[in-house]
Structure formats: C-alpha cells, structure tokens
Amino acid sequence: MTTIIELPEVLANQIAAGEVIERPASVVKELVENAIDAKSSQITVEIEESGLKMMQITDNGEGMSHEDLPLSLRRHATSKIKSQSDLFRIRTLGFRGEALPSVASISKLTIKTATAEAEHGSILVASGGKIEQLEAVSTPVGTKIKVENLFYNTPARLKYMKSLQAELAHVVDVVNRLSLAHPEIAFTLISDGKQLTQTSGTGDLRQALAGIYGLNTAKKMIDISSADLDFEVGGFVSLPELTRANRNYITILINGRYIKNFLLNRAILDGYGSKLMVGRFPIAVIDIQIDPYLADVNVHPTKQEIRISKERELMALISTAISESLREQDLIPDALENLARSSTRSFSKPEQTSLPLQPSQLYYDPQKNDFFTKETVVSEDSPQGFNHEVLIDSDVKQVDNLQVAKTESEAAAPSVKYASRPDPMLSDGEHPGLDVHNKQKLSQMLDRLENEEQSVFPELDYFGQMHGTYLFAQGRDGLFIIDQHAAQERVKYEYYRDKIGEVDNSLQQLLVPYLFEFSGSDFINLQEKMSLLNEVGIYLEPYGNHTFILREHPIWMKEAEIESGVYEMCDMLLLTNEVSIKTYRAELAIMMSCKRSIKANHSLDDYSARQLLLQLAQCKNPYNCPHGRPVLINFSKADMEKMFRRIQENHTSLRELGKY
C-alpha cells in the first residue's frame, strides 16, 4: 500500500492560498491585477468590514466566455502564457493561474462575466472551491467578482488578522499603489458605502499623485526621466523639503508591477545625496520599463520581489536621473510661498455628521503646471462607480485662484487653514532621534529617565559663549562648559514630561482651526489610534477625504508649534504602531524637547544664557539630556593648573602621565 497520495485539488488550492492570500488586501491585489490584465479602463473595488465580510471587484475589461469561466477555478489554468518561452517575456501581472482558485477555496465566490462577442453573459457560484452554480445571465461586458466570508473554512487564519482599520489601511495602500502604476485606469474604492479613493484614469501620473497624496504634495513633486539601451526610467520624486519618516511613500514600478527592492530604494536615496536629513525619506514613484528578458518575476508567491539583470546599471540610472532633476531645481524654500501657505482660506461651515466624501475632481494641466477642476455628472443608467465627466465650461477653474464669494453666512463662519509639515532641514541633526524600532534600547532609556532622582546643581556665574554652541561659566569648583542644546533639551524635556499628562482641562480653542492632510492608509490608521492622541490632548476630527481638522490645542503646546507638533506626533504614532500611553507620552516628551531646543551655532545674549542656566539648575537631572549625553563638563582649579604646568605631581611631566 502506497503512503504517498496526490492531494485533492481543493486541499492543494487551500495550501496555495496560504502563500498567496495573507489578508483581504491580498485578494484585492490579485483580483484587481486580473482586471488590469483584462484591459480594463475602469475598476471599482467595494468592500465591507475591511473585506472580511465582502469584497467586490467590477471592471469593464474583456470578460470571460461561458466555456472559460469554470476553467478559471482550475489550478494553473491561465490565458496569459502558453509555452515555456512565454515565461521569460511576461508582460502581464498574473500568469500562474493560482490566485482565483486560491481565493475560491477559502471563501464563497460569485463571478458574473460577459465578452463583447457573446450573446449573453455567465454567472458562477462556488463555495470552498466547489462550483455550485453555472448558468447564462444578462450582465454588462466585463467581470464582476464577489468574495464573501473570507477564511470561513480556515478559521486559524482569522486569528492573525489585525483590527478592521488596520486591514482597511492595507486595502487602501494596495489600491493606491495600483492607481500609481496604472494612471490610465480609473480606480474607485468604496468601503462600507463610503468612497475612499477615486482616480480619473486620464493617464497623468501627477494627477493620480494629487488624488492620493493631496494637491500640496503633488505640487512639490518633480518629474524624472532617463534611459539607456536596457531601461527607461520615469516618474516623480519629492523636493528635499518634502519628506516622511519611513520608506512607505516610495513606490517602485517595473513594467506596471509594484515591487519591493532594497537596492533600488538605496539608489533613490543616493540620488538625493546629502540633501536628505538622516532618518527622513522622500515621496517617490519610480516607473521603470524594462525588457521582460531582464526581469524574472517568477521568484515570489505574490510577485512583489523580482530578480533583475544589470541591477547595478539600473541603480546608477535611477540615482543619476534623480540627482540631475534636483540639480535643475531651485531648492531654496520660497519664503512668500510659506507665508501664503499659512494664510487662511475660507470655507462654509459644514455639518460634521453629514459631510460627504466626494471623489477628487482635480485634473493636471502640464502646460500651465497647475490643477483644474471638472464637474461630474452621474447618469442613472450608468453602472455603479463609472462616471461621465463634463467640463463646466471652456475655461477651466484654476485651483489656486478659486475664490468663493463671501455671503453673510460665510463671513460669519470660521476660517480654516492647511497646516504645513515641519521642514526637515530645521530638525535636529545632533541626535539620531528615537530608535522606536529598538524596543529594548527605548525601554532602557525610559526606565532610566523615570527613575531619576533630584540632583544638586552648583551655582554658576556665566561669562561667555564659544562658536554659538558652548556656554562658559565659573563656579566654586572651577570652569564649567555647557552644551547649550543639551541644556535646553533637558529643560524642555522635564517641562513637556510634566505638562503632557495634564490634558483634562487644559485645552484652548483655536480662533482659526487647522486642517491636516494624510494619505489614505495613514488617515485610516490614525483614526484607529486616535485615542492615544486624545490622551495627550490632541483631538483631530475627520474633515472630508483624508483630512483632519483641529479645533483646540493643549495649553502646553505653543500655537506656533501646532502645525509641526501635530504632524510629528502623528508620524511617531504611525511608526510605533503599538505603544502604551505611558511610553507614548515619554517618547513624545523626548521628541518635542529635542525638536524645540536651540541648535549649535545659535548665539545667545547674556540674559538668555543666564536664564537657561537658572532653568537648568531647577531640573531634576541637570547633568544629562534625555538621550544620555552630558550637558556640562567641569575643569577644576587643579585641572587647570596641571594643564598649564603650574603644578606637577612628583615632578612627572603630563606627557609621561599619558595626558598630553
């Protein structure tokens, strides 16, 4: 009796699903990629409960015939390759024929499809990989795939799902990446009846960037272009003044496929050279066209990692393209633009409970280097999610020059202004910053800071400053040299540490509320973690699509620090993911004290320097900054006399003692 058996097809598909389908976002990725391969120009993704309850992908592509429909659920059945040679010149996103059978094996699947040549369409219903219904039906040309009760027959997989908001953020990220990879396709994402993302499908990548990352971000992106005999590189990268705290905003595309590649990420950063601050990363969309023979995509279950021939040459091409584009730009920040950015913009006061999430109607005019708007008219006879666009008139509206007539009611309504992100060039370069990913080191730092005891500080008489960095003072024990940045950092750390927890009745109403823009996935993640921000006195309310409004701020935060402070806190929260209130407050106090302290080469007058020393003397631990660096060093009178050889011990020279 043989002990080796061939596994049933359904079981084999479930095993394959373990590699291909990790979460609802994996299903969306595979099915949308199939829609792209079917030459669709419009794709709508609808989900419920972040996709765990239902996902529906509708496209207007080529569709499938009645005969091909049941074959699509067979493993390794595909229309995209037919011979071994095809495997080495793949231009489609899918080719293995594994995704649809894998999805069908762990869910209830319904497919409606029709081709342009067929008299009627077809419907297929399968549960757990077994076909239960296959018959003719009337349906538009294209394909509609509905996935329900994902992982219903593999409950162990459900234990590894994160919260609904986290899973939704993954879905939004997948749709955003595919939208950037294919700006010629109109994408729509709807979650629980709310529209989260919509792109116009005009083929303009900058316009897609504006719809995903916001208008202000898109305006600070510059295009890159370069080519050699093997590669064509295009896309957009952000100016050095526009950065993020992680690499999540870097999108690398090869032949329309989003991939992850450490070396190409490195090439992007090398293109910026020293223009980026340490720990900051650009926003970038790099579109690479390559001969399929030079790329092997058949090395990873999800095809997000590929092998590239001549990878070093491609890295050099990317770095050169970015550095040359940046060289042509005026990288000096425009003071007038910064002033205009902080000016108020009037809006009529909305009803927060009924604020609609409208699709972005921003369109980019490359000749005028600006955006304009279109009015969208939806026909009742059109399929859901597919819009017919009509220009308002022959003259487009310039977004920046759009003026709203002020009626009496609008004049009485409060104004709002868009908050600007902190300039990384103004951040602290003296510290590497918090290593939030090294939990052990962070925990040790927080324990040390928490267990500090009150110290006795000597009386100091300030008398000078050197190089705008070090303060000189004398005391009973000799000469003291103080690092002014570390000193103020310690003072501010103890201030913020004490004040951040006092948020119950310490909120001040803003005369002009601020608006904070985020990408779709970050917006969703922040909504889930909003309670942590509330604990430190930051109350952000959803205000339209991908935007929060701040109406009040904690007393401990100065109004001049609101814009940069809130963005920094949100970035920290997105980086740390899971953090206790206590740890978050401590991290926040360290971060804010470091960012808000005076830097090197900053001259202080006598009064300011003496006040800093008085404040330092009142600190619980005036001898170290929160990172552990010394705040001051001391040369005693004896040390000075030895250095000047006024005294020598046992007639032994200082050089012989090894000191000089």
From Swiss-Prot:
Keywords on record: DNA damage, DNA repair
Family named by the database record: Belongs to the DNA mismatch repair MutL/HexB family.
Claim: Metal-binding is one of the keywords in the record: no
Gene3D superfamilies in the record: 3.30.230.10, Histidine kinase-like ATPase, C-terminal domain, MutL, C-terminal domain, dimerisation subdomain, MutL, C-terminal domain, regulatory subdomain
Pfam families: DNA_mis_repair, HATPase_c_3, MutL_C
Name assigned to this protein: DNA mismatch repair protein MutL
Alphabetical list of NCBIfam families matching this protein: mutl, PRK00095.1-3
MF annotations from Gene Ontology: ATP binding; ATP hydrolysis activity; ATP-dependent DNA damage sensor activity; mismatched DNA binding
Its biological purpose: This protein is involved in the repair of mismatches in DNA. It is required for dam-dependent methyl-directed DNA mismatch repair. May act as a 'molecular matchmaker', a protein that promotes the formation of a stable complex between two or more DNA-binding proteins in an ATP-dependent manner without itself being part of a final effector complex.
Entry keyword annotation includes DNA damage: yes
Cellular component, GO annotation: mismatch repair complex
Gene Ontology biological process terms in this record: mismatch repair
Top-level taxon of the source organism: Bacteria
Provenance organism: Streptococcus equi subsp. zooepidemicus (strain MGCS10565)
